[in-house]
Every structure is written in C-alpha cells, then in structure tokens.
Amino acid sequence: MNKNFIESNLNKQELSFEVPLRPQCLTDFVGQDSIRDRLEVHIGAARQRGEVLGHCLFSGPPGLGKTTLASILSKAMESNLVLTSGPVIEKAGDLAGILTSLKTGDVLFIDEIHRLNRSVEEYLYQAMEDFALDLMIDSGPNARSIQVKLNQFTLAGATTRLGLLSEPLRSRFAFTCRLEYYDPMILQKILLRTSRILNVKIDSEAALEIAKRSRGTPRVANHLLRWVRDFAQIKANNYIDLSVANRALTMLSIDEKGLDEMDKKMLQTMIDHYSGGPVGINAIAASIGEEPSTVEEVYEPYLILQGLLKRTPRGREVTSLGYQHIVGSSQR
C-alpha cells in the first residue's frame, strides 16, 4: 500500500474525476465563509459597473480550493479560464504569448505564482496595471522597444508560499485572501455532496470519520472517499458505514489525526536522530528522503496545526503532544 498517500494527492495535477466534483458557484463553495462573502462583493460590484474583475491572489496550503475559486470567478464573470503555472512561464516571450491570446474579461490563473522567474515577473507588473507590454525587439544597435496593448483581463494567482512573492507583485492584487484548513463538519458536508455525485452509499457517521482523517483538506477527503468506495465495493457490498471506513483507512495507515506513514516517519526521525530538535528543514528532508519544499508545504503546516511540531528560531521541534502521539502509535 502506498505509504505516501498524502503527498501523492497534494503534489499532483488535478485528475479528470475531480472536475465534476468542483463547485460551480460561490453558493456551492462550502467553508471559507469570510472569503466567500468578500468575493460576492468583489464580483457583484464589478458586474454592476460593467468592469473587468480586479486581480485576485489566493494563498494557503495545497488542496484547499484555490483553483476552484479561480474557476468560480470565470463563471461568475461569464468569461474564459486560462490555466498555467509559474514554472512553465520561463521567459518574457512565454508570458507575452499567453497574455496576447486573452480576450477581454478572461481569467488567467497562474498556479505556484511564487515560482515565476523574476525577469518575467517584472513584465507582469505593467500587464496588470496598464494592460500593456513593452517588449524588446532585436539586439545590439538594432534593439528597439515596442508596446503591445492587451485586452483587459483578471489575473488569479495561487501560492502556497506567500512570503516568497515580491512586494511589487503582491501589491498589484485588488483582492487577497488566505484559505485555511477546513473543519471536519464542513468536510463531512463536502463528502456527502461528493458521494451523491459519485453515487456512493455512505452514512453520515462514516463520512465524518473520513473527514476527521483528511487533514482539513477537501482534495484529500475526496481521494480518501474514492479509496473507501473501492474498499467497500470489494469487501462490504458497496455500502460504507463507520466500521468499513475505519478498516479501509487503517489499510492506508492513516491514523485518527490524519497522519500517514511519512508524517509519522518525519516525527520519529526527529525524535530518534535529533532528540526531537531543534533541527533544520534541510536536515529533516534529507533524513526522510523528501525535498525541503515538500516538507514545508505538505507535511509541516498540518503537523504544526495539530500541535505536534513547532518552529523555533533554531529550527523545528517535536512538541510534547508529538512525542505522545508517536509513542502511542508505536504501542498500538
């Protein structure tokens, strides 16, 4: 069984099965109430004035709905959604090609916008403010600058690392928000909605148990539901109750706090090799065979939220709760 279930589902592109599960409007977007309310005002005001929607920046851990919100924006404004990501736009010409193809009102979604090349980012400033691009043609004594006018568009940026965005870029967004982890009761509602779409038979108690082990993340919750559905199909006559959910999740080695084998390996390694810390992120990553960015973006935020890990000026430390959880897990 895959011991990296969480990472495999948070560090990948959206699969085709997820598309019909995505909310189509703000009314269907459950949770993140304050963000939803603010977006209703932002969208409603732009529509009443007949203007293009102001640029939006969504930050927060992976899997919480940043891409979904960008899709909702485009539908609310009755425009097209164009998807790309920071690492894909390597040079100014790549950006120019995307921007010049946009129609008036289109929503350009740049995922991992913090990974944009700095030289490319500088071209984006003018595009966001003036809807124009100054491009250099030729080189040497024949070099000259031409200005390309752009159709007015909305940039929707998404980032898991807000601190890596430059201030000039951050300040050009009219709407900024941070998505937070979801409450289990909200995730239960999302799972029950998903079960109706996928025609999965599940009771509310089982849905809540899956929600509790989903790290506060809708994407993880939906993938867990798919796994439990498959388990129920083979082992439980296609019906998911609490017992079936527990058996299926135990097979994935996902515990009652939503930690998988890699989460526990990280804490165990810190305890065994570094006396619980403090220890630097690069040392942790090397010890468990992961990239530092994966540790920071996928594992660390949830462990901190659960009170199992803390950041200090000298590095990361396992908390007393973290010790208790690892000791308790090893005794079960």
Curated annotation (Swiss-Prot):
<feature type="binding site">
    <location>
        <position position="63"/>
    </location>
    <ligand>
        <name>ATP</name>
    </ligand>
</feature>
<feature type="binding site">
    <location>
        <position position="182"/>
    </location>
    <ligand>
        <name>ATP</name>
    </ligand>
</feature>
<dbReference type="GO" id="GO:0016887">
    <property type="term" value="F:ATP hydrolysis activity"/>
</dbReference>
<keyword id="KW-0378">Hydrolase</keyword>
<feature type="region of interest" description="Small ATPAse domain (RuvB-S)">
    <location>
        <begin position="183"/>
        <end position="253"/>
    </location>
</feature>
<dbReference type="Pfam" id="PF05496">
    <property type="entry name" value="RuvB_N"/>
</dbReference>
<dbReference type="GO" id="GO:0006310">
    <property type="term" value="P:DNA recombination"/>
</dbReference>
<protein>
    <recommendedName>
        <fullName>Holliday junction branch migration complex subunit RuvB</fullName>
        <ecNumber>3.6.4.-</ecNumber>
    </recommendedName>
</protein>
<dbReference type="InterPro" id="IPR036388">
    <property type="entry name" value="WH-like_DNA-bd_sf"/>
</dbReference>
<keyword id="KW-0233">DNA recombination</keyword>
<feature type="binding site">
    <location>
        <position position="66"/>
    </location>
    <ligand>
        <name>ATP</name>
    </ligand>
</feature>
<dbReference type="GO" id="GO:0048476">
    <property type="term" value="C:Holliday junction resolvase complex"/>
</dbReference>
<feature type="binding site">
    <location>
        <begin position="129"/>
        <end position="131"/>
    </location>
    <ligand>
        <name>ATP</name>
    </ligand>
</feature>
<feature type="binding site">
    <location>
        <position position="311"/>
    </location>
    <ligand>
        <name>DNA</name>
    </ligand>
</feature>
<dbReference type="InterPro" id="IPR003593">
    <property type="entry name" value="AAA+_ATPase"/>
</dbReference>
<dbReference type="Pfam" id="PF05491">
    <property type="entry name" value="RuvB_C"/>
</dbReference>
<dbReference type="InterPro" id="IPR008823">
    <property type="entry name" value="RuvB_C"/>
</dbReference>
<dbReference type="InterPro" id="IPR004605">
    <property type="entry name" value="DNA_helicase_Holl-junc_RuvB"/>
</dbReference>
<dbReference type="GO" id="GO:0006281">
    <property type="term" value="P:DNA repair"/>
</dbReference>
<comment type="similarity">
    <text>Belongs to the RuvB family.</text>
</comment>
<keyword id="KW-0234">DNA repair</keyword>
<dbReference type="InterPro" id="IPR008824">
    <property type="entry name" value="RuvB-like_N"/>
</dbReference>
<feature type="region of interest" description="Large ATPase domain (RuvB-L)">
    <location>
        <begin position="1"/>
        <end position="182"/>
    </location>
</feature>
<dbReference type="InterPro" id="IPR027417">
    <property type="entry name" value="P-loop_NTPase"/>
</dbReference>
<keyword id="KW-0547">Nucleotide-binding</keyword>
<comment type="subunit">
    <text>Homohexamer. Forms an RuvA(8)-RuvB(12)-Holliday junction (HJ) complex. HJ DNA is sandwiched between 2 RuvA tetramers; dsDNA enters through RuvA and exits via RuvB. An RuvB hexamer assembles on each DNA strand where it exits the tetramer. Each RuvB hexamer is contacted by two RuvA subunits (via domain III) on 2 adjacent RuvB subunits; this complex drives branch migration. In the full resolvosome a probable DNA-RuvA(4)-RuvB(12)-RuvC(2) complex forms which resolves the HJ.</text>
</comment>
<keyword id="KW-0963">Cytoplasm</keyword>
<dbReference type="GO" id="GO:0005737">
    <property type="term" value="C:cytoplasm"/>
</dbReference>
<dbReference type="GO" id="GO:0000400">
    <property type="term" value="F:four-way junction DNA binding"/>
</dbReference>
<feature type="binding site">
    <location>
        <position position="219"/>
    </location>
    <ligand>
        <name>ATP</name>
    </ligand>
</feature>
<keyword id="KW-0238">DNA-binding</keyword>
<feature type="binding site">
    <location>
        <position position="68"/>
    </location>
    <ligand>
        <name>ATP</name>
    </ligand>
</feature>
<feature type="binding site">
    <location>
        <position position="316"/>
    </location>
    <ligand>
        <name>DNA</name>
    </ligand>
</feature>
<dbReference type="Pfam" id="PF17864">
    <property type="entry name" value="AAA_lid_4"/>
</dbReference>
<feature type="binding site">
    <location>
        <position position="67"/>
    </location>
    <ligand>
        <name>Mg(2+)</name>
    </ligand>
</feature>
<dbReference type="GO" id="GO:0005524">
    <property type="term" value="F:ATP binding"/>
</dbReference>
<feature type="binding site">
    <location>
        <position position="67"/>
    </location>
    <ligand>
        <name>ATP</name>
    </ligand>
</feature>
<feature type="region of interest" description="Head domain (RuvB-H)">
    <location>
        <begin position="256"/>
        <end position="332"/>
    </location>
</feature>
<keyword id="KW-0227">DNA damage</keyword>
<feature type="binding site">
    <location>
        <position position="172"/>
    </location>
    <ligand>
        <name>ATP</name>
    </ligand>
</feature>
<feature type="binding site">
    <location>
        <position position="21"/>
    </location>
    <ligand>
        <name>ATP</name>
    </ligand>
</feature>
<feature type="binding site">
    <location>
        <position position="22"/>
    </location>
    <ligand>
        <name>ATP</name>
    </ligand>
</feature>
